[in-house]
Amino acid sequence: MTGELTRREMLKAHAAGIAAATAGIALPAAAQPVPGGVEALQITWSKAPCRFCGTGCGVMVGVKEGQVVATHGDMQAEVNRGLNCIKGYFLSKIMYGTDRLKTPLLRKRNGAFAKDGEFEPVSWDEAFDVMAEQAKKVLKDKGPTAVGMFGSGQWTIFEGYAATKLMRAGFRSNNLDPNARHCMASAAYAFMRTFGMDEPMGCYDDFEHADAFVLWGSNMAEMHPILWTRLADRRLGHEHVKVAVLSTFTHRSMDLADIPIVFKPGTDLAILNYIANHIIQTGRVNEDFVRKHTTFMVGATDIGYGLRPDNPLEVKAVNAKDAAKMTPSDFESFKSFVSEYTLDKVVELTGVEAGFLEQLADLYADPKRKVMSLWTMGFNQHVRGVWVNQMVYNLHLLTGKISEPGNSPFSLTGQPSACGTAREVGTFAHRLPADMTVTNPEHRKHAEEIWRIPHGIIPEKPGYHAVEQDRMLKDGKLNFYWVQVNNNVQAAPNTQNETYQGYRNPDNFIVVSDVYPTITAMSADLILPAAMWVEKEGAYGNAERRTHVWHQLVDAPGEARSDLWQMVEFSKRFTTDEVWSTDILDANPGYRGKTLYDVLFKNGNVDSFPASEINKEYANREAEAFGFYIQKGLFEEYASFGRGHGHDLAPYDRYHDERGLRWPVVDGKETLWRYREGYDPYVKPGEGVKFYGRPDGKAVILAVPYEPPAESPDDEYNVWLVTGRVLEHWHSGSMTMRVPELYKAFPGAVCFMNAGDARDRGINQGAEVRIVSRRGEIRARVETRGRNRMPPGVIFVPWFDASRLINKVTLDATDPISKQTDFKKCAVKIVSVA
């Protein structure tokens, strides 16, 4: 590398400056896209995926003297083509906060563990001794259902896979769930219910082929800015291309919208049915496609809101226990069902102008226009999140606009490996790898065979999901709990009443593995210091099915260790006699006396690759600790679940040479579009389109109605609260709030409010207010200007700020099918602080 910049590099640097200026940030030298001069010659560069969202941007990571000193967009990465968003340009700083955790911390009093004690540094041996003692006591007294783990869409693939083995096969508990339950569960359930397989059929290449983009509950300009640049490039470079943006308030993505639609919260259900009706009434159903490739069903209605069973809304719900039921139907019945959603009715219900609704419907109905639908939390964090996901598939299936370049219903992802780890590995309470489930006896048997464990080890009943875990902790039914790579006391709904109380329940022992002292960590009994990002070898899977692997580039500080090391090392403290039932051991005496480490991780699969296979230019502390290439062993064992079943992954070593590959990877080739002949190797010549995840090869078109949210404004609590993110921060802010430039750009959460609403209440711009719900309250300053422009009766508060815990206010209602929380709709009142 020389000290000179090429014209291309200058353009990339200029783009970075524009992105930074948008956020009001000056790029320091450490964040420059391409450092130059003599200093650059002393930096070693290696590839890795970005640590933040699910876009999966490639970055080049610069290391000098054992520390990450710079990052820039990877110009060889197809996803981002050298660009990064403003968070990505500050990746070099996320690991170096001054309060980085470097040693285990245990609550102690008088030299021994005490629930009400103060945190004191301890050795790893003491930490694991106390941890194992607590786990064994709970297992002996209450059994496997009292042991649980809460993981993350930020786990590497190896970490998630190790967790699912440790919990399901080791402790025989399905009480494993990821924080992706809060963000992607509705999308995953809808994929499975519609296509029989999870994850998008398209890819990011669709951005260069679509003639229309429809954003449903997605502020891509701030939350997926790199993909937004690809969308904007297509829109601004081609006059015929249109953009529609639907939201409950006006945000930055609407600056590019040809069809800006602000609707009343929850009424997107009605809009989707109106569009389906419009397609049918105007005679633009692709009848040949529908006849050959779809089947019709009717969903159960009045399904409740996923609240506690004794909540009045659950008691009166007719089908709360059968929420997922779908009954066979036909096209004529579907036509009759959606015919009730007339333009006039939907205008009245949603508050949207008729002209905008008609223009939107015509985008989907026009047979000559390729449409890409995009959505994130506005759809998924919804008490009818599975429904709205399936309803957008209805539109693409009715018109045949699916599984080909530019015609793509595309669920965007919020975490770097919510797809690759939470969904593909199967760290949800009901799942196994490669779309298999614990409720299916053949799937359990298959997993037990791959894992080389006795039949009958994996329990058949799904475990507690994320919100239910909090409730069970509070109720004293879940007593040993290990949290990794998430900040759930800040992130969970109704956290003051349902989450924090469970963490501090004296009957429970809570372990949190993290890199910083988050609210969740400080609520625990034992804190384990974790390695992060390039301090370990890792693999992520992004939103377009792209698996990306990286080497360990630097060491973690102090005694911090990777989550993988922590789980595998902890498994050595248990023998099968302590965790498996007597009848299983009597039938399989060869397993007696073995440690879980021997059974799960030194099983002839995971330990089959010697450490000598690791690239000599890179460290691998886990391989040093265990004596074999554990990441490769875990990956190859995991990959055996999906090969030949439509989830094929390439050999592990190939990923080190690639900027990621999109599965299924068959005969060395990645798949860009699934389910269509000519693109997907699983679709045979002559089949055209085949949704092979379902036995009949047909996708489901589902009839479901508009139903109101769990809570709406009334005379006292007369404002809708919507929560979400901002450009500068990611999730709970535990990383980005420690980057000085990002903190200065947006130092604290504010209450975005309609100016007229503020005037009516005598509230000035910048004034402090109380945001009060039936569950709790916080204080924040009012913002009536700026990026988010609120309609009357709606406020928006981001949740990154630990000093303003907006989730003290939110409602713990969930989609009854997916169990995903609705963070977008609850009722509050705004009270001026005089």
UniProtKB/Swiss-Prot annotation:
KW Lipid biosynthesis (keyword) present: no
Main location: periplasm
PTM characteristics: Predicted to be exported by the Tat system. The position of the signal peptide cleavage has not been experimentally proven.
GO MF annotation terms: 4 iron, 4 sulfur cluster binding; electron transfer activity; iron ion binding; molybdenum ion binding; molybdopterin cofactor binding; nitrate reductase (cytochrome) activity
Cofactor comment: Binds 1 [4Fe-4S] cluster. Binds 1 molybdenum-bis(molybdopterin guanine dinucleotide) (Mo-bis-MGD) cofactor per subunit.
Entries under CDD domains matching the protein: MopB_CT_Nitrate-R-NapA-like (cd02791), MopB_Nitrate-R-NapA-like (cd02754)
Catalyzed reactions per annotation: 2 Fe(II)-[cytochrome] + nitrate + 2 H(+) = 2 Fe(III)-[cytochrome] + nitrite + H2O
EC number of the protein: 1.9.6.1
Compartments reported by the entry: Periplasm
Domain 4Fe-4S Mo/W bis-MGD-type: 43-99
SS bond partners: none
Binding-site positions, substrate: 799
Alphabetic keyword roster: 4Fe-4S, Electron transport, Iron, Iron-sulfur, Metal-binding, Molybdenum, Nitrate assimilation, Oxidoreductase, Periplasm, Plasmid, Signal, Transport
SUPFAM superfamilies: ADC-like, Formate dehydrogenase/DMSO reductase, domains 1-3
Residues engaged in binding [4Fe-4S] cluster: 50, 53, 57, 85
Region forming the signal peptide: 1-31
GO aspect biological process, one term: cellular respiration
CC terms in the record's Gene Ontology section: membrane; nitrate reductase complex; periplasmic space
Sequence similarity: Belongs to the prokaryotic molybdopterin-containing oxidoreductase family. NasA/NapA/NarB subfamily.
Subunit-structure text: Component of the periplasmic nitrate reductase NapAB complex composed of NapA and NapB.
HAMAP family (UniProt xref): Nitrate_reduct_NapA
Name of the protein: Periplasmic nitrate reductase
Organism: Rhizobium meliloti (strain 1021) (Ensifer meliloti)
Lineage, top ranks: Bacteria, Pseudomonadati, Pseudomonadota, Alphaproteobacteria, Hyphomicrobiales
